[in-house]
């Protein structure tokens, strides 16, 4: 088995074929490019041959004279010639159209013979294409066509487009998950969509313009860390709010007791102390106290303390 590469095409466009008993077997594939090259070579050879065999001006002039004025032995001369004999100068230059006419006729005849030969061999070429079964092909190399950085950028854009399409097709599910997380109707789940929506919801509550598409650049580990941080922050904040409400209730009771004892200057102290001031001044201490006392995130206790805080501000207990 002999493999012969045909490399008359471009660098990456390489075709190979293998046949038994090559080169004795002449029935191999000829591509359209090879056929055009053969035709061009044949025309060039014809032009060179015609330029080499063109007769001299004297020979063309004598041939033209023989055609125009035949000999005396010619029957046409005996019957038709009525003009007197004239002297013809041999060194007269021949007409240019005569030489071009001869060259064009020879070229047309050779091209006709070549076309006939090609048409006769066309069936054999088509049969050889169906008979050859061991012809491997090779596609152009992608490394030459595309740049590495450009291919990476195209892949990244394709991934972003696919994620956007997936988010568009699942918009209703995303809205349901967002509603459940926002109103707390279901506990947090460790799914990718819930984590991402929880992060976006927290960012929007704090006035940060963040969308789900902005989180596409984050890896799964980063999403998990952000989600855990937000969850821990909410839990610690709930514990801190419980301690803060207890402090506000105690301050209101002390204010009423001092007013009862006649300290009018203490009036309005409870209105000056708010949750924000407590959070700024002793927020970390409240968090530490809640952790030491083991106060958990109890929604019931938080609601009770909130209601009690409102009533203590309005009602005089002492």
Curated annotation (Swiss-Prot):
Its main location: host cell. Induction: Expressed in the late phase of the viral replicative cycle. Keywords: Coiled coil, Host cytoplasm, Late protein, Phosphoprotein. The keyword Thylakoid does not apply. Residues 145-172 form a coiled coil. GO terms for cellular component: host cell cytoplasm. It comes from the Viruses. It is found in: Host cytoplasm. InterPro entries: Poxvirus_A11. Phosphorylated by a OPG054-independent mechanism. Belongs to the orthopoxvirus OPG137 family. Required for viral crescent formation early during virus morphogenesis. Homomultimer. Interacts with OPG160. This is Protein OPG137.
């Amino acid at each position: 088995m002999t493999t012969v590469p045909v490399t008359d095409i471009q660098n990456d466009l390489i075709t190979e074929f293998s046949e038994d008993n090559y080169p004795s077997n002449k029935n191999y594939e000829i591509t359209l490019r090879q056929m055009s090259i053969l035709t061009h070579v044949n025309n060039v050879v014809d032009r060179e041959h015609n330029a080499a065999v063109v007769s001299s001006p004297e020979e063309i002039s004598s041939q033209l004279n023989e055609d125009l004025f035949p000999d005396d032995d010619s029957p046409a001369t005996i019957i038709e010639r009525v003009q007197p004999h004239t002297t013809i100068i041999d060194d007269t230059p021949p007409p240019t159209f005569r030489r071009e006419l001869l060259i064009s006729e020879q070229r047309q005849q050779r091209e006709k013979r070549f076309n006939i030969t090609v048409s006769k061999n066309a069936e054999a070429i088509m049969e050889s294409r169906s008979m050859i079964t061991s012809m491997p092909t090779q596609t152009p190399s992608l490394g030459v066509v595309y740049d590495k950085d450009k291919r990476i950028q195209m892949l990244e854009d394709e991934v972003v487009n696919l994620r956007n399409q997936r988010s568009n097709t699942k918009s209703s599910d995303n809205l349901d998950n967002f509603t459940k997380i926002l109103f707390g109707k279901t506990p947090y789940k460790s799914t990718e969509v819930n984590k991402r929506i929880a992060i976006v919801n927290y960012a929007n509550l704090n006035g940060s313009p963040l969308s789900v598409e902005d989180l596409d650049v984050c890896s799964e580990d980063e999403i998990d860390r952000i989600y855990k941080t937000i969850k821990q922050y909410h839990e610690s904040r709930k514990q801190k709010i419980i301690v803060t409400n207890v402090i506000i209730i105690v301050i209101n009771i002390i204010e009423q007791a001092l007013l009862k004892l006649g300290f009018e200057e203490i009036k309005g102290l409870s209105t000056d102390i708010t949750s924000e001031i407590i959070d700024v001044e002793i927020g970390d201490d409240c968090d530490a106290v809640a952790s030491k006392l083991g106060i958990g995130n109890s929604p019931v206790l938080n609601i009770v303390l909130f209601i009690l805080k409102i009533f203590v501000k309005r009602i005089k207990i002492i």
